[in-house]
């Protein structure tokens, strides 16, 4: 039980963010499901075949008793389980098509969903923490060990002729830099002279006309993000900025997080609390103007993006007005240098247009804070304007629609409405009574009369 609770809690924290249920709530839900005979063991929760019966049973219980706590917890857990399963299938497909091995040839069906690795190893009493390399090694076909060399020198012992390393494995291929970034053009090329550089490490490469300078910051591969999203558009680059005692430093955004955010926007909508939590997490670091505009292009459609640009400009004008009144405003750099202006904050000043490196070098820490905060506030406004709350009162379960899909649509509409939080659960239960299919309504009519009162 404890192992399952830990696995489910971890999945909910990953896919639900701030709305994830506590371990206590998950444990109470699992205990109830076992008590009602819906689960033979806690690990049966991983089987998709048990999800619909659990949803129907918890819904009926909520309608009879008027308590929706377990139903709400199950809704979050179900969303996390579905997201984890979809991500697993996508990962296995990517491994197969890229020829990486360790994955299934075809995506698994609903009946063959696997338990998480942590749960499987806890059940066997073995140590937790098997690495991905170990799992891939177990699943990959066995190969006959043969001597392998690279060029004229053995990778393992460095001997040019007569190498005795019969079991030495081939070295990993050198990383080939993406053509998207000129600063990575020299990565992976062998040096004509001098000592060998460790494989996988980036070669220092000076900018044109500046010999001896350190390499530029690592950039997020937005081309990879675009491929994962199967979308077309101009190549984009992002550099989240972190300010420390030594000056600005850059850490690349994780493409997987951006892909997940775009998927959340597509499935949950802009007004969903889950969407807002993921956007706030991605924008918790200081971003450049180039960053925020490209991020919004990925997650917003053309019309919402135009609305966001207008709202962002209004927010930046507010910052400029405050900086004009106060010469020592953080956006003015505490009175050092020129005052901030709209061109600087939008990345349109000299040396910044289309140049994220120039933006990182010329923008002050206070300006970066203002840019990111204004972009986030503009996104909140667009979420309210571009995607008004759906009419939850008009939602009805379709003839061929599963109860789970109907419940998801209804809960999404109610959560995105202007109803106070205390009224949402009763409204959801009332809609279940009136808008569900006849068989569900029959169950409700068979319930005690207190449910209808």
UniProtKB/Swiss-Prot annotation:
Location of region: Disordered: 128-150, 181-217
Family annotation (InterPro entries): Gag_M (IPR004028), Matrix_HIV/RSV_N (IPR012344), Primate_lentivir_Gag_pol-like (IPR050195), Retrov_capsid_C (IPR008916), Retrov_capsid_N (IPR008919), Retrovr_matrix (IPR010999)
Keyword Ligase recorded: no
Keyword GTP-binding set for record: no
GO BP annotation list: viral budding via host ESCRT complex
SUPFAM superfamilies: Retroviral matrix proteins, Retrovirus capsid dimerization domain-like, Retrovirus capsid protein, N-terminal core domain
Pfam families: Gag_p24, Retro_M
Swiss-Prot/TrEMBL keywords: Host-virus interaction, Viral budding, Viral budding via the host ESCRT complexes, Viral matrix protein, Viral release from host cell, Virion
Motif (PPXY motif): 172-175
Listed Basic and acidic residues bias regions: 128-141
Domain notes: Gag polyprotein: Late-budding domains (L domains) are short sequence motifs essential for viral particle budding. They recruit proteins of the host ESCRT machinery (Endosomal Sorting Complex Required for Transport) or ESCRT-associated proteins. Gag contains one L domain: a PPXY motif which potentially interacts with the WW domain 3 of NEDD4 E3 ubiquitin ligase (Potential).
Note: Gag polyprotein: This protein is synthesized as a Gag-vMyc polyprotein.
Protein's UniProt name: Gag polyprotein
């Amino acid at each position: 039980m404890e192992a399952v609770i830990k696995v489910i809690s971890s999945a909910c924290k990953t896919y639900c963010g701030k709305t994830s249920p506590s371990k206590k709530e998950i444990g109470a839900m699992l205990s109830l499901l076992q008590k009602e005979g819906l689960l033979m063991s806690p690990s049966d929760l991983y089987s998709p075949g048990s999800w619909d019966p659990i949803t129907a049973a918890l819904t009926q219980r909520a309608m009879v008793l008027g308590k929706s706590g377990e139903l709400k917890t199950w809704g979050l857990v179900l969303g996390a389980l579905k997201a984890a399963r979809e991500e697993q299938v996508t990962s296995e497909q990517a491994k197969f098509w890229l020829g990486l091995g360790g994955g299934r040839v075809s995506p698994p069906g609903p009946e063959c969903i696997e338990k998480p690795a942590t749960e499987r190893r806890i059940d066997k009493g073995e140590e937790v923490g098997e690495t991905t390399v170990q799992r891939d090694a177990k699943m990959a076909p066995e190969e006959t060990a043969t001597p392998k060399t690279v060029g004229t020198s053995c990778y393992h012992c460095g001997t040019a002729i007569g190498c005795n390393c019969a079991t030495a494995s081939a070295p990993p291929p050198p990383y080939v830099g993406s053509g998207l970034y000129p600063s990575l053009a020299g990565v992976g090329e062998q040096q004509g002279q001098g000592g060998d550089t460790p494989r996988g490490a980036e070669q220092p490469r000076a900018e044109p006309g500046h010999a001896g300078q350190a390499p530029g910051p690592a950039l997020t591969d937005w081309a990879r993000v675009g491929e994962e999203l199967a979308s077309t558009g101009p190549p984009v680059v992002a550099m989240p900025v972190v300010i420390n005692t030594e000056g600005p430093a850059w850490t690349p955004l994780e493409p997987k997080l951006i892909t997940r955010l775009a998927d959340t926007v597509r499935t949950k909508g802009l007004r969903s609390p889950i969407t807002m939590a993921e956007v706030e997490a991605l924008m918790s670091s200081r971003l450049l103007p180039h960053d925020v505009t490209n991020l919004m292009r990925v997650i917003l459609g053309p019309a919402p993006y135009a609305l966001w640009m207008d709202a962002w400009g209004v927010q930046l004008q507010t910052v400029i007005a405050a900086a004009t009144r106060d010469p020592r405003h953080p956006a003015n750099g505490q009175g050092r240098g020129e005052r901030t202006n709209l061109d600087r904050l939008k990345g349109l000043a000299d040396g910044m247009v289309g140049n994220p490196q120039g933006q990182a070098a010329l923008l002050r820490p206070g300006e970066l804070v203002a840019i990111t905060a204004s972009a986030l506030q503009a996104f909140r406004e667009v979420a309210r304007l571009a995607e008004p709350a759906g009419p939850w009162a008009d939602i009805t379960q379709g003839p061929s629609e599963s109860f789970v899909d109907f419940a998801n649509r209804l809960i999404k509409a109610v959560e995105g409405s202007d109803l106070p939080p205390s009224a949402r659960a009763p409204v959801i239960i009332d809609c279940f009574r009136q808008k569900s299919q006849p068989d569900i309504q029959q169950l409700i009519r068979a319930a005690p009369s207190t449910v209808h009162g």
